[in-house]
Amino acid sequence: MNAPTPTLRLFLTLACGGLAACANGGVASLQSSETAEQASLDAVREASRIRMVSGAGRACELSVGDVRVVALLDGVTDTGSTYPFVGANSTKRKVERAARAAGRTEALFNVNAQVLEFNGQLILIDGGYGSFTPNEKTGHVMDGLRAAGIRPEEIDAVFLTHGHIDHLGGLVTADRRPAFPNARYHMARSEYDFWMGDPDLSQTTISTKFQDTLKQQGREAMMALQGRISFVDDGDTPLPGVRAFAVPGHTPGHLNYSFGASGASSAADARSGIRHIGDLLHMQQFQLPNPDWQDGADTYPEIGIAERERVLAELAASQQMVMTGHFPWPGIGTVRRSDIKPDGYVFVPATGCNELTRG
């Protein structure tokens, strides 16, 4: 290759403010990138202090204002390696470094459900895998209910965050009847239509085989609930003190629910209570420090990222108590901004969830 002409050399020198400045700028950029990645790894280590719990069929209870929450552990699910289930829009190297920093390379996480005693009713949020479980490690919400001394027929209302089988499956019995015979089942109309139609899961990182399984199981479970479903939409108050919030991306009709002060139905009151964030994210140790990392189960990844960033910012500002679908059980606490990574977050678990063993 020919050496730069004097004219080109002069242009490069002027553009950089001097050749040394070009070199220094490149070094500074590299150092900045390395510093940012180190901050991300440190934030992952901080988030990883909260560890997934083993076992299944457990229950504990605590009170948040006038809401009694019973946290149920359906079990532990395994989606394979961390990458590409998390961070497919990043790089494999960065995600694997984060996994090593977290001390876990597998995509393992808890599956949670909750019962709320609120306004004189017993309300179930999601139902775990139920009889659709792929193995004995999940499918134990009913065991948790027994530990809490709650019978299925005592549940007055069920609120479904979305139609993935680890949330929907436990709402029906093995012979495909409603598992909670006296309850109405609340969900988004768009979610029902999605699973009853021809769901497009092509933007997920889930294998084609498992996509087909999710479609078949989702439709089968939805069919079993026909005639018992009440549809809700963004901003609806299906019960006094309960408000639905549309948080699409994970699925088209993915909903959050807030449970506010007794008898209240305004949005402000709902935000002052406790909120279920569904599958806003799966693996808090990676996606709280890096909310812009794609979730492999998101139907619409870009929307999922935007909604995750929006909701996390709101929760950090409000300090509203949250319930979660997949954070380490019991998965109840608050979200705050990370002190290590400015655009990251940290989960602060609630204390005092007393384990129940009534049998």
PLM segments and residue spans:
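C-terminal motif of bacterial Sec signal peptides marking the signal peptidase cleavage site
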Residues: 19-21
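Active-site neighborhood of phospho(di)ester-bond hydrolases with catalytic His/Asp-centered motifs
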Residues: 124-127, 156-163, 186-188, 246-249, ...
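Cap/insert and terminal regions of metallo-dependent hydrolase folds
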Residues: 258, 262-359
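Metallo-beta-lactamase
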Residues: 23-150, 154-157, 181-184, 188-246, 265, 271-279, ...
